[in-house]
A protein has these predicted regions:
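Surface-exposed, charge/polar-rich loops and edge strands
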Residues: 78, 88-93, 101-105, 116-161
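A general structural motif
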Residues: 17-19, 43, 90, 123
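Short glycine-rich anion-binding loops that position phosphate/pyrophosphate groups of nucleotides
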Residues: 26-28, 98-102
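Residue-level signal for inorganic ion chemistry
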Residues: 22, 46, 94, 110, ...
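Charged helix-capping and loop-helix junction motifs
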Residues: 108-114
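Extended, well-folded interaction surfaces typified by the phenylalanyl-tRNA synthetase beta subunit core
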Residues: 19-84, 132-138
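Phosphate/pyrophosphate-binding loops at sites that engage ATP/ADP/AMP, CoA/4′-phosphopantetheine
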Residues: 11-15, 81-87
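Single conserved hydrophobic/aromatic residue that forms the stacking wall/gate
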Residues: 2-13
């Protein structure tokens, strides 16, 4: 499903983001391909996650022919044909979820890839991308789950206070 960006994400994106980690939508996740096209046209660096061993995540900037169907059937950059970015190089991280709450906690797919990776993104604004229907009263989180800076849905932006 294509995702219409709210003004809130647009403001963060325009001001702060030169190097962005986003994702190739899988299943019912919000599709960010329109944002990716616009960002690429503006000369921004776009990286995508690659799932690795021991539930690790790598940010990879794919080359022109640098895509494959990766683990879990997700469109993924081919590491050997990509530029690898350190987490500290990212300005903005856009994170998918299956559910989120007003405190900006997220529920992912259960493997913890993002929860292990996000603390290393010390310079990045971390924003969850979701549909309003995914908002819950209290997300079922564990001690390792990471709080995001904000969430953007088709209706607006939720910021953690």
């Amino acid at each position: 499903r294509d995702f219409c960006l709210s003004r809130g994400l647009g403001d963060v994106y325009k001001r702060q983001a030169q190097t962005i980690l986003l994702y190739a939508a899988f299943g019912s996740e919000a599709d960010l391909s329109a944002l990716a096209e616009k960002a690429q046209a503006q000369g921004k660096t776009l990286a995508y996650p690659v799932c690795g061993e021991a539930y690790s995540l790598t940010a990879a900037v794919p080359g022109p022919d640098g895509w494959e169907m990766g683990q879990y059937g997700i469109r993924t950059p081919i590491l050997s044909r990509s530029e690898i970015l350190l987490p500290e190089a990212l300005d903005l991280v856009l994170v998918p979820c299956t559910a989120f709450d007003a405190d900006c906690f997220r529920v992912g797919m259960g493997k913890g890839y993002y929860d292990r990776y996000l603390p290393r993104c010390k310079n990045a604004v971390k924003i969850g991308i979701a549909f309003e229907a995914q908002r819950v009263e209290h997300a079922a989180v564990d001690e390792h789950d990471q709080r995001l800076d904000a969430y953007v849905t088709e209706r607006g932006i939720y910021k953690w206070k």
